[in-house]
Every structure is written in structure tokens, then in C-alpha cells.
Amino acid sequence: MTDLPAQLERVHMVGIGGAGMSGIARILLARGGQVSGSDAKESRGVLALRARGAQVRIGHDAGALDLLPGGPTVVVTTHAAIPKDNPELVEAARRGIPVILRPAVLASLMQGHRTLLVSGTHGKTSTTSMLVVALQHCGFDPSFAVGGELNEAGTNAHHGSGDVFVAEADESDGSLLQYDPNVVVVTNVEADHLDYFGSPEAYIQVFDDFAARLSHGGLLVACLDDPGSAALAQRVAARGLPGVRVLGYGSAEDADGAFAPIDGVEVGARLLSFEARDVGGVLQFQLAGEQAPRTIRMNVPGRHMALNALAALLAAREAGADVDEILEGIAGFGGVHRRFQFTGREHGVRVFDDYAHHPTEVRAVLGAAADLVSQPHEADRRESEEPVRSGKVIVVFQPHLYSRTATFAEEFGHALDLADEVMVLDVYGAREEPLPGVSGALVALSVSKPVHYQPDLSQAPRQVAALASPGDVVITMGAGDVTMLGNQILDALRAAPHHHPSR
């Protein structure tokens, strides 16, 4: 039995192993659909889908459309990652099988639910995941589709029994305008994906258009620390959309007078302080209408994560969850795969991995790392006979996409200056062909801190191990295959003679 629309009963997905596509496949399977798909290579996501009954072929050919008895009722693909001459898309056109994009499927799956959607240039996955975990702790069983794997759930998607659906609303190709949300969270708005939008103005406009799709009685939750999302909140509040409320959150030096409206935007929560502790931190904040501040301990690092927690709190409260229980859930949130994820520790060197691939994300992660080096790991304190000094931040950065590297090379360089030592790898091109003169060296030229350009990925682990000392934090950073270097760096640290490089 299936409760799916007829078109989604037998679905073939091109690029099924990707973060967004695999999540949709999980939900389709859980709702009784038949799913087939193809991907360029084996992955954990592909193996997990096969275990749930999906028929997946590695490589792309027209015969993949025959994996399901009777063939697919629809073929699903992503906006840009799949070339139009893909043999499966060509065969679908020949057979007259409709080809639709992933967001159209997600919009269909969300019908009949109260939808809580998280958008913004950065922080979508972490905030969405925090919101899901908080609601689950409160006894909700929401459906969700997230761009990363929740550490608690070990999955990026779920078909829940409740009437709430939580999802990321990806703005990269404007497809978020297919959704009709009840609650929208906007973490920040900063020009990106200009290869698609063409101008910063067009990129910003898509958020205005998205907010305009809020249903009557809906809520826009926006970060007031970010100029882009604050301006969006002001525009929406001034426009007076029928039945739509606007609620801001952000930083304040103290609680006194912190809840006066800011440029017409009501303030719902204020971050009073964030103090780094080991691999997490202590967050003090105050909610509008409450007399006293609240304090919670978080298991994820960085002031940006503290702000994300306030966004998740306000959205979960709007869904009907109890504030105290929401905070318990947020306190237990263990993070998302590849979002400042702890890889391991060797000889007093802590290694983390992060997906950051935009200058603002790089700055946020390196700021959190700087807090960490002033807070040595408890194990280092126990193992050292002498006080453990604070260390340095070493970042191994892999630029993602030639177009983004060409646009932001100088900004990446300035952002990487927040580290003490920088290694820049070559560009991970993903779907793009190389651009003349664009490589990791372009980014390295804009770094003023000690920098190493290393185009040979295989040489990086040994080189990083030679740079690191006890107390240091190493971060592998980028949206490509740099993630595989973390464990290799730990292996290199184990193999290296115990040494203390000069600083």
C-alpha cells in the first residue's frame, strides 16, 4: 500500500546517492513507493537505500530505466549536477516519461503537513537538524529532509507519523519557490550562486519571494545579526503580509531593553553570551516576555551555532513544543555529519571536518576553532604533566567549484587569515569544467598568514602532521573529497616521530 500520488509510485532518481536525493528516496520508500536510481559511484547512502529496497545501478545508461517492473512513472533529477545528455534523461524523453526536479517531489511529499522550512545562505543544515532533534525530544515525530546526516539519527530523512514536516529550503536555483511554508527560518542572506542568479539583487529577491509564500498565520524567523536577513525581516514587516508575523533573534550586550522592536521587527530571543567549552559551549540568552536569562550547555562549538539554536527554539515553539523540553533537546544535539565534526585526536592534536565552502562559512568555522584552541581537550590535560598551552589553528582548505573560486578567491584568502597556518588544495570541480587561470593557487595568493599551496592531495596528510603540535586544532574544510583527509592526517600523526615544530 502507498499513500503517494500516482506519479510518485514508481520513481527513478538520477544521482540518487546525493544528500538531497537520497533523503527523498528514503521517504518515498517509507511511504510505500518503488524506487530505482543510478549514481556515479558506490557510497554509504547508496548501500543504505539498497538495504531499504531501492534498485540502484552504478554508472549511467538507458537500461537503468528498466530496473523497476513496468518502468518508472517519473524520473527525478537535480538542478545542475546532472548533464542534459545523461543517457537516462535522454531515454526518459524518448519514452515520454516525465522528468521533474527534486524540489517538486519534496513539495508533493510535504502536502497536508505543517511545514517548517529553514533557508539562508549558510547554516541551513545545522539549524534544520537542531530543530528536528528538539522536536523529537519533545515527543513529536516529524517528517524531515535535511542536507546532512544527523549524528543522533544516522539519517538525513524520515517519514514521521506526525503532521509536522521540517526541511531545508535550498535557494541555489530558486526552487524553494515551489514550497508553501507555515514557518520560515532565514539564518542569513548573502550573495551566492551567482552563476545561476546573475546578480546579488536577483539572489536577494528570491528570499523576498519565498517569504511572500508564507501561509496565513505563518511566521518568519530571521537573524538580526546578519545584515541581509535583518533587511529581509524589515521589508516583510513593512509590507504587512496578511496574517504573517515576523520575529527576529540576535545578539545583545545585556537583557535590559533588548526586546524593543528593531526597525519594526519584533525581537523574540537575544543571545547574551557564548563561552567555548571543550568541543561545545555555554549559551546564555533571554526570551521575550521572560524576566530572567536562561543558560544551556551545547555539544557543538561556535557562536554561529548558538544563534542557530535560538532560531530552532523559536521555530519549535511555534510548532507547539514546550520551551524547557526544546532546550533539553538542543542541549543534547550532537551535530551533523561534516559540520564541525570531530574526527579524532592524536598526540594532543584535535582534527575536525567541516563542509564550509563560502567565505562567510569559513570565517564562522575558524572563529569557533580559535575558541577551541584556548580550551584544551580534557584528555590532553590528564595526559600532560605540565599545563597544556593553547595551540594554533591549521586549516586544510579545498575550494569548491571553479566559478565560486573565481568569484570569491580574494574573500576566501581573507577569511582563511583567521587561521594560524593555511594549506590550500586544488579546486574540487564537481560538475564544472576547469576555468583558465583558476586553481587553489588563486586563493593561496590572497592569504597573508603562512600558507602552503598543495595541489597533490596525497601529500597533504604528511605535510599537515609535520606542521602540527600538541594543543593544535586541524580542520579539513570544503564541500569536496577533502573530508577523506581527516583520518589520513591522524594516521600521519601516529606515524610521525613525536616532535614539536617551531612556531
Swiss-Prot record:
Its main location: cytoplasm. Keywords: ATP-binding, Cell cycle, Cell division, Cell shape, Cell wall biogenesis/degradation, Cytoplasm, Ligase, Nucleotide-binding, Peptidoglycan synthesis. It is found in: Cytoplasm. GO terms for molecular function: ATP binding; UDP-N-acetylmuramate-L-alanine ligase activity. Transmembrane segments: none annotated. It comes from the Bacteria. It is an enzyme of class 6 (ligase). Pfam families: Mur_ligase, Mur_ligase_C, Mur_ligase_M. GO terms for cellular component: cytoplasm. One of its GO terms (biological process) is regulation of cell shape. Pathway: Cell wall biogenesis; peptidoglycan biosynthesis. ATP binds at residues 120-126. The keyword Cytoplasm applies. Belongs to the MurCDEF family. Cell wall formation. This is UDP-N-acetylmuramate--L-alanine ligase. It comes from Rhodococcus opacus (strain B4).
